[in-house]
Design a protein with these regions (language model features):
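Acidic, low-complexity intrinsically disordered regions
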Residues: 1-242
Length: 242
């Protein structure tokens, strides 16, 4: 069985935490912890060839920066091209195995919408059947790509937009979208991610490091209890300087 099949299988009764006959999705004001659900959706299509080390290095640097701090961080890493492949499935960030070049092999097309849609469904189901005290306070989707959607077969842009709107408006989930070679703000807007959560990056060594450093800054601000703004553009300032 491929990892992607295991990752997206229906929840079994043993996974229901004592709730086999129903479940509740808790709203953002009802959190009982300071934990974070951190979901990476990373482009592994053929156009990313030549940037393997930059992608892996940027990802690993972000993981290292997010270690420590208050609350647990559960990391899921979904790589996508024509299909989806899972490197991490809700692994505690303190225990996570960093990626290597062997984990990242670009090929194929860009099924971005399917990667987002299936990941939202998976995390939503986890939260739905979890005990209230186990649902993380923060849920953050970090999405990176270097090209336009061209291969999804399950989800449309309008369906993803509806899903993201529900999760952001009702449950306080955050989605950030950082892209190269396309208009990130326009593309993000088509799927319901507002412009304050979107940015472009350059495909260079410095550009990749700025990309992951900026995304890490967004996550740091969200995890912080200092009420730091996420709408002032400061989290992506480093990208503007590249």
């Amino acid at each position: 069985m491929k990892k992607s099949e295991r990752y997206y299988k229906p929840l079994e009764e043993k996974d229901l935490h004592g709730k086999p006959e129903g479940a509740t999705l808790y709203k953002r004001t009802e959190s009982l912890n300071n934990d974070t659900e951190l979901v990476f959706i990373i482009d592994e299509s053929g156009s990313m060839s030549g940037f393997e080390s930059d992608t892996v290095g940027g990802f690993n640097s972000m993981i290292k920066k997010q270690r420590g701090g208050e609350g647990k961080v559960y990391v899921s890493t979904v790589l996508f091209n024509s299909e989806r492949r899972v490197v991490h499935d809700r692994v505690d960030i303190e225990d996570i195995r960093l990626m290597s070049d062997r984990d990242y092999s670009p090929s194929g097309c860009t099924a971005l919408l399917d990667a987002i849609g299936h990941s939202i469904r998976h995390i939503s189901n986890i939260h739905k059947y979890a005990r209230r005290e186990d649902v993380p306070k923060n849920t953050i989707f970090v999405i990176t790509t270097d090209g336009m959607e061209n291969a999804s077969s399950t989800f449309s842009a309008s369906e993803i937009k509806s899903m993201i709107k529900e999760k952001t408006d009702e449950f306080g989930w955050e989605f950030i979208f950082v892209a190269a070679n396309i208009d990130a703000i326009e593309t993000a807007g088509r799927i319901g991610i507002k412009k304050e959560r979107a940015a472009n990056y350059r495909q260079s060594e410095a550009g990749f490091m700025a990309c992951y450093s900026s995304m890490s800054e967004f996550v740091r601000r969200k995890r912080s209890d200092n009420n730091e703004s996420l709408d002032d553009g400061e989290w992506k300032r480093e990208l503007a300087d590249i």
